Curated annotation (Swiss-Prot):
Keyword Phosphoprotein listed: no
Keywords linked to the UniProt accession: Methyltransferase, S-adenosyl-L-methionine, Transferase
Enzyme Commission number(s) of this protein: 2.1.1.297
Reactions listed under catalytic activity: L-glutaminyl-[peptide chain release factor] + S-adenosyl-L-methionine = N(5)-methyl-L-glutaminyl-[peptide chain release factor] + S-adenosyl-L-homocysteine + H(+)
Keyword flag Cell membrane: no
Function, as annotated: Methylates the class 1 translation termination release factors RF1/PrfA and RF2/PrfB on the glutamine residue of the universally conserved GGQ motif.
Enzyme class: transferase
Disulfide bonds: none
Protein known as: Release factor glutamine methyltransferase
Binding site for substrate: N186, P187, P188, Y189
């Protein structure tokens, strides 16, 4: 079977399974199966697949048809122009989270020597990206999951990003009295009440504790905010990714913060909140 024939067959199966973005999935998984780039697929469409390549592609397509995210099948996802390892132990990095990185870039000069904490680091995409974009930052990252931290540590090592990692339930492992110049987080913020609106591949395959934040999506955030306040220096910044339905409740929780603002994503949906701890 040629590359084109294999692609066309896979596309039909993915469409029949009502897979989101079937053409993209077919391409990504064919590149994965052949260990090639997209240009290769278009340059050699009549090239015959080997038996091993065909078997690998068939298995990948079958997994995708059952809802498994393509990123878990390939083990990779791009974030802010860098390749990150992913596994079912971590939330898949999303383009929306890049708005948090952009918000940090708007606040901080590249040469700052700030101490920064990433809470709930998951794959480490935020922490490692900040360490690369701000080489003088001292970045610490925490997560409750040891399995997630293994992925995060591997990503930092691959990218040569200097990050200190700790297992921690929110900020519980941070020393009393230790304070940071900035704390960032992409906490679980989807409400259980919204579960019927969440894609099957997210509900069935991504870590539940990294997606859902209680009935209304606020349980973790309500615990997180006072801990962040305690561990931020006066004048320090807090940036957090949020969902479209919780901007107002988050604003209420952060009513004592200054410089509060909500940063929308490209669709105009509230995506990142920014607040500053008063200097006095």
């Amino acid at each position: 079977m040629t590359l084109k024939q294999a692609f066309d067959s896979a596309l039909k199966h993915l469409e029949a399974a009502d897979t989101p973005s079937p053409r993209l999935s077919a391409e990504l998984l064919l590149m994965f199966s052949l260990n090639c780039d997209r240009a290769y697929l278009f340059t050699y469409p009549e090239r015959e697949l080997t038996a091993d390549e065909q078997a690998r592609y068939d298995e990948a397509i079958a997994r995708r048809c059952h809802g498994e995210p393509a990123q878990y099948i390939t083990g990779h996802q791009e974030f802010y122009g860098r390749d990150f390892l992913v596994s079912p132990a971590v939330l898949i990095p999303r383009p929306e989270t890049e708005h948090l990185i952009e918000a940090v870039l708007e606040l901080a000069p590249r040469e700052v020597r700030w101490e920064v904490l990433d809470v709930g680091t998951g794959s480490g995409c935020i922490a490692a990206t900040l360490a690369k974009e701000f080489p003088r930052m001292k970045v610490t990252a925490v997560d409750i999951s040891p399995e997630a931290l293994q992925i995060a540590q591997a990503n930092a090592a691959r990218l040569e990003a200097q990050v200190e990692f700790r297992v921690s339930d929110l900020l519980s492992a941070i020393e009393p009295g230790r304070q940071f110049d900035m704390i960032v987080s992409n906490p679980p913020y989807v409400g259980e009440c919204e579960a019927d609106k969440v894609q099957r591949q997210v509900k069935d395959f991504e870590p539940h504790c990294a997606v859902f934040g209680g009935e209304r999506g606020m349980d973790i955030i309500k615990r997180l905010a006072p801990q962040v306040w305690e561990h931020l220096k006066p004048g320090g910044w807090f940036l957090m990714e949020i969902g479209y339905s919780i901007a107002d409740p988050v604003h209420e929780i952060m009513r004592d913060w200054t410089n509060f603002k909500v940063v929308p994503d490209l669709r105009g949906i509230p995506r990142v909140v920014v607040g500053r701890k008063p200097t006095s």
